[in-house]
A protein has these predicted regions:
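Negatively charged
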Residues: 179-312
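Basic/hydrophobic alpha-helical interface regions
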Residues: 1-168, 172-190, 201-205
């Protein structure tokens, strides 16, 4: 299941239920706000997003959001409200996190899929897309840091779409691109995924892990598409070299299934941490709004007093 879709999937998306149209408007508004665009439309409903929680179609400028995942199957459309209102966002943090991730694709994944496919083979293209997932969050959290905890609230939906069901070296590189890269992006903290990072580093070795970290760091910072193409090639070359050296089923106790479970456990804990952080963030924003309101009223009172003095 992909977030960024460059071609139409088999079968058209069903038309959104009429009762979700108003929510679709507010999802589009929030996506445009976070992506710094004004052309994005949204398709929202219980059957939207083609099996994913959410996805973005660059060629349609369309975001799709699965309401069962984003809001929960028991949430009625009229209960959602205006998602551009910060107060409403705290009612549905998972939905806002999914929308923010897709909005960051809309904002930063402004590259040609056909050009990239011409430059890279299929394996390199997959590596490019893997690295792109954390790059957009790295870029986005610099521009819109407020949404970090919302994205963390949806971290399982964003990450486990790419659950690594492969062997050894492939699994280690996949998890490095999903988890280690998001630590470097600032979405996750290393202490939260210490077990996962440790397993991957132990298997790959310190030298290779450092090399991959360098690729990720440069990819995150790069605004040059051709440079990112080359980094994807380097990623795949490093993976092939590692597989040749270690073999696909080396000794040493590395278990891809156990690693996948460790990822899931860590991300579940992160969601809990994010919910606590969001409660604190909401309280801070309420307090800031109160202080601002008092300041504005004080200024207005002083202006009124000054005007009264002029009259008398």
């Amino acid at each position: 299941m992909e977030h960024l879709r460059h071609s139409d999937p088999e079968g058209e998306s069903p038309p959104p239920p009429i009762e979700w149209l108003k929510v679709g408007t507010t999802v589009a508004d929030l996506t445009n706000q976070l992506s710094a665009r004004n052309d994005i439309i949204a398709l929202v409903g219980p059957d939207a997003a083609h099996g994913a929680p959410a996805c973005f179609f660059p060629h349609h400028s369309e975001v799709e959001l699965n309401t069962n995942t984003a809001f929960g199957p028991r949430t009625a459309p009229e209960d959602v409200g205006d998602l551009t209102d910060p107060k409403r966002q705290y009612e549905f943090p998972r939905a806002v996190g999914l929308i923010a991730h897709e909005a960051f694709h809309a904002r930063y994944s402004r590259w040609s899929a056909s050009e990239t496919a011409d430059q890279l083979n299929a394996e390199e293209f997959k590596a490019f897309e893997l690295l792109e997932e954390s790059r957009i969050e790295y870029q986005g959290l610099q521009d819109v840091p407020r949404v970090r905890e919302f994205i963390r609230s949806a971290v399982i939906d964003i990450n486990l779409e790419h659950r690594p069901e492969m062997e050894h070296t492939e699994a280690a590189f996949q998890v490095f691109g999903l988890i280690n890269a998001r630590v470097q992006a600032g979405t996750l903290e290393e202490r939260e995924v210490e077990d996962v990072v440790g397993q991957v580093t132990d298997f790959l070795g310190a030298e290779l892990s450092l090399h991959l970290s360098g690729i990720v760091s440069t990819f995150h910072e790069s605004r040059d598409l051709s440079e990112r193409h080359q980094l994807a090639r380097e990623w795949v070359a490093a993976k092939h070299e590692a597989a040749d050296q270690r073999g696909e089923k080396p000794d040493g106790g590395f278990d891809p299934a156990a690693l996948a479970q460790a990822v899931k456990n860590a991300l579940e804990d992160i969601i809990l941490t994010a919910s606590i952080a969001l409660a604190d963030q909401e309280s801070d924003e309420v307090a800031e709004a109160f202080v601002l309101d008092v300041q504005q009223k004080t200024k207005q009172r002083k202006r009124n007093e000054q005007e009264a003095e002029k009259l008398f």
